[in-house]
Structure formats: C-alpha cells, structure tokens
UniProtKB/Swiss-Prot annotation:
Biased composition annotated in UniProt, kind: Basic and acidic residues: 35-48
InterPro entries tied to this protein: P-loop_NTPase, RecF/RecN/SMC_N
Region: Disordered, residue numbers: 1-144
Name of the molecule in the record: Structural maintenance of chromosomes protein 6
Length: 1185
C-alpha cells in the first residue's frame, strides 16, 4: 500500500510502506498523537517531503498525555536514530527547484547558508520532473484525481431557479454576459462544500443567497470518487454527491449521497472527512479565486496580506500554527520543571528534620514493656470471662430440656373426646324433634290448601255480586239522566224566542278576540328581537368584564410586586422571610454547633451578571430553591431547623457532598460562546452553590433567549446543542420539547420583576410605579365601558319584563272573551224532538233494576253457605299449632344444651392450643439457649485466637479483672505520655521520614524524566523547524521561478520578494515591450501602476505559480481576463491551457464575461455559455461546446 507525497513540483508522488512507517514514527516523536480509529484522518506536515497538520484534538491529547518511562526510552531511541541519520535526512527531505534569481526577501541567516546546497538538488529535480511529464504525455493521459467536480446543480440559488453544469475532467470555461449568474456557480460551490456567507462577499447570512420569492435553495455537487484516494468506494461508489439546503429562515442542512443518489449521511462531519480525504481546501482563497479576490489581490493587498495568501495557498500557515503550539507545550513543561525544583528543595528539608527527630526518640522502653505485659493479661482475661459465661449457658440448656407439657396436653385431649360424644347424642335428639315438627307442619299445610279452595269459591261469588251491583248502579244512573233530559227538553222548548240577540253578542266578542290575538303575535315577535339583543349585550358585557378582571389582576399584581420590592429595599434579607437577618446572625453566632457552617439562603449568595435575566432565572430555579440552605451533614440540618423555629422560619435544607471546585462540565467545550445559559449568567463566591444548582436544576442545560423567535431558531432546529433541554425568556415563559420532539410552550404563572434575585431595587421600584401609572387610566376606562354595558343589559331586561306583562294581559283577555262566548253558546236553545220515547225507555229501566235486585239476594245466600265450610279445617289447624309449640320448646332446650357443650369444647381447644404454644416456646427457648451457648463457644474460640496472636496463654492472677488491668494500662500509658509529651512516637517519626524520602526520590525521578523529555522535544522541534524553513525557502523560490516563467510568455519579467522574518511578500513586474533600442527594460515594477490588462495577466501568472504548490484536485478563478486586451487574453488563455494540458489529473474552472469563440473544445476542454436568466423565474439557458 502507498500514499501520496507532496513534491516540490506541486504534484503527487508515491510513498512506499517503509517511508510511510518512518514518517509515522516521527509524528509520534513530535506530538504524541494517536490517530482516530473511526475515520481515515489525513495528517499533513513537512516531514520527508510530506505535509502534516495536527488537529486541535491531537494538540489536546499532547498536552494531557502523561510522560511514562517507556515513552521516554522510545523518544531517546528515536532521537539517537535521528542524530545518526541527520545528514542523510538533510539531503533527502528537501529537493529545491533551480532558481536563476535570488530570494531577495530572505533575511534569515540559515536560509542564506543553505542556498548553495539546495541549488544542485533543484536542478536534478527539474530534470526528473520534465522527464516524468514527457513520459506521461507519450504514454497517454493521466487519470483524473479523486475529488474533481463532475457536475453542479443550483435550485432557487441567487438568480437561478434551476441550473446544472456537467464538467469535464480538465478545463472548463463558464462564459456569459454580466448579470447572467455565472459567478454564482463558484459561490454555490464553496457554499455547498461548507463555506460561510461572509466568505462569499455576497451577503451577511446564507439566507441572503436564496432566490427572491422562494423559501429554500438547494445546491448539489457531484465529486469523482475513483482512484487511490477514493473515499470509501465500497460504500459510495464511483461518485460522492454532496447536497446542501438553505432555508429562508436561516437554517441549512447537508446530505451526503452515494453514486445512485441514496442518502448515506446528513452530518457535516462526514462532509469534512470527504474534503479532507480529497484534499479540497475550501477555506483557501487561492484554490477558488472569487471575483472580488481576483480584482483586489494585486490592487489593494499589502505585502503582509500577500504573504498570508502565499502561506495559505501552500498550507504553510497550518504547519506554523502547529509548531507554535508545540513550542508552547515545551514552555509549559519547563514551567513544570521550575515548580518541581521548589518542591524538591522543600522535601529535602523535611527529610533532614524527620531523620533527626527519629534518632532523638530512641528511648523510653521500660514503660512500654510493662504496658505490653498488662495488655497480654487483659487479652486472656477476656477469654476467661467468656469461658465462665459458656458454663452458665450450658446449665440453662440442661434445665430447659427437663421441662415438658405432654401430660397436660393428654388430659385435655381426653376431656375433648368426652365432649364430642355428648355433642353427637344431642344432635341425634335435635334431629328426632325436628322430624316430628315437620310432620305436623305438613298436616297443617294440607288443611290450608282446603281452606284456600273454599276461599277461592267465596271470592268468585263475591265478584259476581259486585258485578251485578255495578250494573244496577249504571241502570239507575241512566234512569236519572234520561229523566233529566226529559225535563230539559220541556224547558228549552219554552226559551227558543231569545236566540237571535245572543248570536249577535257572540259575533261582536269574536272580533274583539281576533284583535287581541294579533296584538299578542306582535308582542311575541318583539320579545324575540329583545332576547337576541339581550344575548348580544350579555356576551359583550361578559367579554368586557373578563378584560376588566384581567387588567385589574395585572394592576393588583404590580401593587403586590411594588410592596415586595419596597420590602426588599428596606432589607435584602426580608425578601426571604421576616426575621431572616436575625436568623442569619444567630447562625453565625452558633457556628460551633455545626460541623461546618451552613450556606444559605442560596439566593443571597447568587449574583446576576445581567439584570434583565433576573425574572427568567428566578422562574427557572424557583423561589423555593432560592430559600434553601446547604448543609454538610444531617445533624447540621436538624440543628439549623431548630434555630429557624426560634425565629418562626421554616428551614428547608439539602445535604451536599464536600467538593473542592466547580464541576468541570462539558458546556463550555460544546456550546456556542454567544449562547446564554443560566449557568453562564449566574455568579457566586461559593462553588458549592453552583454545583448544587448543576445537580438539582441542571442550570448548564437551561438556555436564555430574548424572545420566542430567537429561541425557536435554536431550540427547534438542528443548531440546538445536544443536552440543551429548555429555554426561558425575560418574562419567565418556558420553551421546551416533548418526548416525541414536538415544541412545548408554558407561559409564566406570574409576570413582572424578580423579588429575590435583584441587582438594582430602586430601578425596579420606579419601573413598577411607571407600569402602574400607565395601566390605571386604561383600567378606569375599561370599568366605565363595562358599567355602560351593564346598564344596557338592565334596560333591555326591563323591556322584556314589560313585554311579558303585556302578553299575559292579552292572554287573560282572550281567555275571558272565549269563556264569555262559550257561556252564551251554552245558553242557545236548540229545537228538540218529541220526548215520548224517553219516557218509554224510563219504564224499561225500572224493570231491569228490579230483576237485578232479586239476583243479588240469591248470590249473597250462596256466599254465606260456602263460608261455613271453612270452620272444621280452621279448628284442626289450631290443634296442630299447639302441638308444634310444645315440640319447638323441647327442641329449644336441647339446642341450648348443644351450645353449652360447644362453648366448653371451644375453651378446651383454646387450652390445648395454649399448652402447645407454651411447649413450642419452651422448645424455642431451649434452641435459643443452645444457639447462645454455641455463639459463646465461638466467642471463646475467637478471643482465644486473638489472645494467642498476642502471646501464649498465661495465668491471670485471681485478684485481677478486666477493669483492674484496664486501669493499670491507662495509668502506665499516662505516665508514658507524660514523659514523651510534645514528641512523636518512634513509629510515626519513622513513617514520616520514609514517606518524605520516598516522595523526594519519586519527584526527583519525575524531574529528571521531564527534563530529558523536554530536551528531546526541543531538539527534535528545532531540527524539524529548520527543515520546514528550508522547505519554505524551496517553495518560495519555486513560486518566484514559475511566476517569472509565466510572465515571460508575454515578454514580461518579474520577481517575488519574500521577507519570511517579517512576513511580507512584494510582487514586482517589469514590462519589456515597445522599448527603445538603447533601453533594457522599464522602471515599471509596482503592480499598482499596471494597467487593468497587465494587472490581470500578472494575477494569472501569480496564481499559476501558487497553484504549482497546491494539492487540491481542482482550481477555479473568476473573471481572470476582465481587464485584458485581446493579446493579453490570448496569451493568458494559452498559458492556462498549456498548464492544464501538462497536468490532466487536475481540473480547472475559469469564469469570464467574454464569448471565447476561439476556444477549441475537446474531451478535455469544455465551454459553457450562460444566458442571462429571467429575474422573475425560469430556468437558465446553457449552451455547451
């Protein structure tokens, strides 16, 4: 396997595996970096002709990596290898290009000394390069590099609605009139590959590049992915497609697709890896020279800016930064060595002091020996005492085994058996009496059935009697009515003369009734209109009343807030409760009662860097948390609550761990520095409070935004950093996401000023007073509007009530007239027939009534006869009831006896259960005694083992006990302490001496290792920096040579004067045309004095010189010929074409406003002619040659 190498001719060469391994070892020696295992990270530096730029991650690893002895040995070995082969490296690492001129800008002595040595190598290198290119041309076209642009597509970007170009692999010209949008192609290219809006000089933000009247712009760039430098070809195929979408709202996103258009990733990190693999330098202005850069480069750029462009184009600036970082790290190592020297001096002093102290303590042995004897006796005295306790427990076990409850349980079982037999006999008697009672009840049931049959017959007869009585009554009623009708007919016949006057009265009253009904209909319609008006007024009144209540609540809230602020102004502590000041004084006075002084209330120790966030932070943290106290132990918290109770303050506290500093959160490493969070806005002198808020409230994950628009642009887009969970605005409103990722908004419960977190109470009071004064007129006006609507509602309610009264009056009059008409109609006399038939029917009814009376008397006699049949059966039932009562009484007595026996049996069972429990407890007690006996035996064994470890068993004097021996040990120990007071023990002194001596050896070894490592690093860095200087000199000379060669195509001469020490680059161009024969050149050297065409041609020549040292697979330049005449343009184009033809593996893109009709197209040359788009929309027309 081989890798590409940057040669001095700007082209890629192959490195074999052996060279690659040597360079990787050198990388480890210099920066101790480890390559990321997840992606193919290309390191670029100046080492054996290869470029390597360590990333920030490598620098951080270098600073944090500990220095081990193994690494030190490796560095020593590498250093010795480098020293032995340094002469060879100096000859092989840098191959300079032969320069006919001198580097007039180089003021570095080292550079001047190496000029002669490098010239010879440069000549051979040019010859080899010329031969290589000639062989390529003869053998065929070189394969295009991976990373060249195959096509680019623009949708709704700048002036283009839809625009696509398919590039060839070598030379591409994009021609078009001014305003045709040809420059937008290069802008789209750099934007799609990751550039920011400011880099394009076409707007302050990316959304400015979205086409007018559209919402989203899409740029798609297709890159070649073939060859040795292909990026994961098995995954992406022969092309990689990068798509970037830009929204009008300012958001943007990436998609990385394979050859078939399938999305593989949507992360910018993958885009960066692809650009790094292809060596595409999108931030290098020399790689893609835009219109503005092209016009201003030679005009306005100063020597320093031009030198920076040179470094950026050749990537030397990245290596400069890397060497600077390593130099800073070496300086830090030297600072560390200085600190180690101070520590070693202190440790040497302590070692001497501890050694002297130990030698002074070699005495006082007699008392210690006596104390040791007493301690031995004390150890065995505990054994003797435990052995006595074991004997007592052994006796208790024997006594417990002698106790037994078996005889008592057997007697109770015998009595229970006797009771069970008696209960069985009683149950038999109960069954016998129960059977007799059932027989008597069956007989009674038979009698009852007979009685029921008789009663049914009796009821049937009674029903017939009642039916006949009903018919008789009906006949009598008909007779009465018929008789009444006869009399009425006779009376009406006498009144027929009065009918006409009554009919006239009925007609008159009918007209009055019609008039009243019409009036009632009018009143009903009027009421419906009034009801609608009333509903509308009520709705308006309710709305205005709601508004009034809301405004009143806001005004009262401001009043309460003003009172709170005034209370806060009187005393900052009063905002946390009455008596808080005295309570805090009491805590300070009682600090001895605490293991460590409590902290709180938390809010008193918090300061806000910007007062505008006070209410938002108070809402996010909560007032309850601000009132909280922090303690370091539970007893401290209990003591704190007791003190608070004395002042009527309920104390809430939280136990916190001991820490030494604020948590090292990842927030400051990941979040945008311009993004405000609660943690960044807060400040406190106590790191315990900050850590507590991080643990309980996650203040590092709560963002702050000025308004909803600003918060939405961060929280609900891809810009939202991972871990940022919610936002608050200055009004205390909360913005967050649900579990499914949907937006969630929660308005603040109370709005206004913060009362606990304050910076300026006077300003807050004045603001609150101004708010109250501004709201009061509107509140009074709103109350007036509500009162007017209330009066209107009452007025219309009165109209509705009056309408109801009018309707009721009409209804009463209509009813009265209706009744009067009915009464008159009832008095009208109708002509009737003869009533003789009615008199005949009356006689017939009299006969029917008489016949029914006779039938009813017969049925009553039958009923009396049937009722007499029930007597014998009822008498028999009474006798059966007497027998059942006697049997029931006897059965009750037997059942009472059964209950008594059952109760006795229950008591016996309880007694037996109690005996069984006592027996169980006795067995449990016996087992407990045995277990205790075994436990004491184990204690005896354990104490014996411990005592044996101290000494062999010794006899304890009979007059000695644990107490007496302990007292003697204390007495002798006090005497020993008295004699050795103010001195350490020999053991402690020896340990201190040994620890200090070991620390001294360890730190001395560390100092030697670090000092040796710093020497190796500094020597290696100096050697590499010298190589880099020679490499820089080689590149600058080659750039100067190529610049002069390219200028000579038009008969110009020029030079690039480098001042590496001061970072300056001066460009000189001298014209040699149209000169008198007696002159050798013009004095025109400053590029600002050149004409537009001359300056453009010089720019092309300089850029081509820089391009010779670039590895980017494609180059682009906008309006390179804008100020040239036809001659300059022809020479410039021929120069560009010839350079492109020499290097078919690279791709060139040139943008020009001219037609380029003379350009001959081929497989390797393509011309795109862009017509101006219609600004209101439409596709761009492209003609391709």
């Amino acid at each position: 396997m081989s890798k590409r190498k940057l040669g001095h001719d700007g082209n890629s060469h192959e490195l074999d595996e052996e060279e690659e391994e040597e360079e990787e070892d050198d990388d480890d020696e210099l920066i101790h970096s480890t390559q990321d295992q997840d992606r193919p990270h290309k390191q670029q530096r100046v080492e054996n002709g290869k470029q390597m730029t360590p990333t920030k991650q490598h620098q951080q690893q270098q600073q944090q990596q500990p220095i081990s002895n193994g690494r030190l040995k490796k560095l020593k070995a590498q250093s010795s290898d480098e020293e032995s082969g340094s002469s060879e490296d100096d000859d092989e690492d840098v191959e300079d290009v032969d320069s006919s001129g001198s580097d007039s800008g180089s003021s570095d002595d080292d550079d001047d000394d190496d000029d002669d040595d490098d010239d010879d190598d440069g000549n051979s290198e040019d010859e080899r390069e010329a031969v290589r290119r000639e062989q390529q041309l003869k053998s065929g076209v070189t394969e295009p590099e991976a990373g060249i642009i195959e096509s680019i597509t623009l949708e709704n970007f700048m002036c283009h609605r839809h625009f696509k170009l398919d590039f060839c692999s070598n030379v591409n010209f994009i021609a078009g009139e001014n305003g045709s949008g040809k420059s937008a192609v290069l802008i789209a290219l750099i934007v799609c590959l990751g550039a920011k809006a400011g880099f394009t000089n076409r707007g302050s933000k990316l959304s400015d590049l979205v086409k007018a009247e559209t919402n989203t712009a899409v740029i798609t760039v297709k890159l070649r992915n073939q060859g040795q430098e292909a990026f994961k070809p098995e995954k992406y195929g022969k092309s990689v497609i990068i798509e970037r979408r830009i929204s009008r709202t300012g958001s943007s996103g990436y998609k990385v697709k394979d050859y078939n258009g399938k999305t593989v990733s949507d992360k910018f990190n993958d885009v960066s890896l692809i650009l790094e693999q292809f060596n595409i330098q999108i931030d290098n202005p020399m790689s893609i020279l835009t219109q503005d850069t092209s016009r201003q480069f030679l005009n306005s750029a100063g020597p320093q800016d031009k030198y920076k462009s040179f470094l950026m184009a050749t990537q030397l600036d990245k290596m400069t930064k890397d060497y600077t970082t390593i130099r800073e790290h070496i300086d830090k190592i030297k600072d560390m060595l200085s600190q180690k020297v101070v520590v070693i001096q202190e440790l040497e002093k302590k070692v001497r002091e501890y050694n002297k102290e130990y030698k002074d303590l070699q005495q006082m042995v007699g008392l210690e020996r006596k104390i040791s004897e007493f301690k031995n006796q004390l150890a065995w005295s505990f054994v003797v005492e435990s052995e006595r306790e074991a004997k007592r427990k052994e006796k208790q076990v024997a006594e417990a085994e002698e106790r037994s409850f078996d005889n008592d349980i057997r007697k109770v079982d015998e009595t229970i058996e006797t009771y069970n037999k008696s209960i069985e006999d009683i149950k038999k008697d109960i069954k016998e009496f129960t059977d007799q009672i059932k027989i008597q009840e069956q007989k009674k049931e038979t009698n009852n059935r007979e009685i029921l049959t008789i009663e049914r017959e009796e009821a049937k007869i009674q029903t017939q009697i009642e039916a006949n009585n009903k018919k008789r009554q009906q006949r009598k009623q008909r007779r009465h009515l018929q008789l009444q009708s006869i009399n009425e007919i006779k009376e009406r016949n006498a009144q027929l003369a009065n009918n006409q006057s009554k009919l006239d009265e009925i007609k008159k009253k009918g007209q009055q009734k019609l008039q009243l009904e019409a009036r009632k209909e009018e009143l009903i319609k009027e009421k419906e209109d009034l009801m609608r008006d009333r509903e509308n007024l009520k709705r308006d009144h309710q709305n205005q009343r709601t508004i009034t209540q809301q405004m009143n609540r806001e005004y009262e809230g401001l009043r309460v807030q003003l009172n709170n602020l005034r209370s806060t102004q009187k005393g900052e502590n009063q905002a946390y409760g009455k008596g808080m000041t005295d309570f805090l004084h009491k805590i300070e006075a009682s600090r001895r009662n605490f293991s460590k002084l409590p902290i709180g209330p938390i809010g008193l120790s918090l300061k806000i860097k910007n007062e505008s966030w006070a209410f938002a932070i108070e809402s996010a943290i909560s007032k309850a948390t601000l009132r909280n106290f922090l303690v370091f132990s539970i007893p401290d918290g209990i003591t704190l609550q007791k003190l608070g109770h004395q002042f009527g303050i309920k104390v809430d506290y939280t136990k916190i761990p001991e820490t030494t500093e604020v948590y090292k959160t990842v927030e400051h490493d990941e979040l945008d520095p311009s993004l405000a969070t609660v943690l960044r806005v807060l400040d406190s002198p106590s790191h315990f409070i900050i850590n507590f808020l991080i643990d309980t409230k996650k203040v590092e994950q709560i963002g702050l935004g000025n308004d909803r628009k600003e918060i939405d642009s961060v929280l609900y887009t891809d810009r939202c950093p991972r871990g940022l969970s919610q936002f608050f605005d200055p009004q205390g409103n909360n913005y967050s996401k649900t579990k499914s990722g949907n937006p969630f908004y929660q308005a603040a419960k109370n709005s206004g000023e913060a009362t606990m977190l304050r910076v300026n109470s006077d300003a807050a009071i004045q603001r609150t007073q101004r708010d109250m004064e501004s709201k009061l007129p509107a509140l009074n006006q709103q109350k007036k509007i509500e009162q007017e609507l209330s009066s209107d509602v009452q007025a219309i309610e009165h109209k509705i009530s009056q309408n109801d009264q009018d309707q009721n009056q009409c209804s009463r009059k209509i009813l009265q007239i209706t009744n009067e008409i009915k009464s008159i109609e009832d008095t009208l006399v109708q002509q009737t027939d003869d009533y003789s038939e009615l008199e005949i029917g009356l006689a017939s009814l009299d006969e029917e009534i008489k016949s029914m009376d006779e039938e009813i008397n017969i049925q009553k006699a039958q009923r009396t006869e049937v009722a007499a049949q029930k007597g014998p059966f009822a008498e028999n039932n009474r006798a059966l009831d007497d027998q059942i009562d006697v049997l029931s009484n006897q059965l009750g007595n037997i059942e009472n006896n059964l209950r008594k026996f059952n109760e006795g049996l229950r008591k016996l069972n309880n007694n037996k259960q109690a005996l069984l429990q006592q027996q169980g407890r006795s067995a449990q007690e016996r087992d407990q005694f045995k277990a205790e006996y075994q436990r004491i035996l184990e204690i005896v064994k354990e104490k014996t083992d411990k005592a044996t470890q101290i000494c062999e068993r010794i006899e304890i004097p009979t007059n000695e006990t644990n107490t007496t021996l302990t007292n003697k040990i204390i007495q002798y120990t006090k005497q020993l302490e008295k004699e050795s007071r103010g001195k350490r023990s020999r053991t402690e002194a020896l340990k201190l001496f040994q620890d200090a001596n070991n620390s001294l050896k360890e730190i001395s070894e560390q100092r030697d290792n670090i000092e040796e490592l710093a020497t190796i690093l500094e020597r290696n860095l100096n050697e590499r920096y010298k190589k880099w200087q020679r490499f820089r000199l080689s590149i600058s000379r080659r750039s100067d040579q190529y610049f002069n060669i390219f200028l000579s195509k038009k008969g110009y001469t020029g030079s690039l004067t480098f001042d590496h020490q001061n970072g300056k680059l001066d460009i000189n161009v001298e014209l040699q045309k149209a000169l008198p024969s007696n002159q050798n050149g013009t004095a025109k050297g400053d590029t600002k004095g050149l004409s537009g065409g001359e300056r453009s041609f010089s720019t092309v020549s300089l850029l081509l010189a820089f391009w010779e040292n670039m590895e980017c697979p494609f180059r682009a330049m906008d309006e390179f010929d804008v100020f040239m005449d036809e001659v300059n343009r022809s020479i410039s184009i021929n120069l560009l074409m010839s350079k492109a033809e020499e290097n078919r593996s690279k791709q060139y893109i040139f943008v020009t406003p001219l037609a380029l009709n003379h350009i001959k197209t081929s497989e390797y040359v393509k011309v795109f002619r862009v017509r101006a788009p219609v600004r209101t929309g439409g596709d761009v027309t492209v003609e391709t040659d």
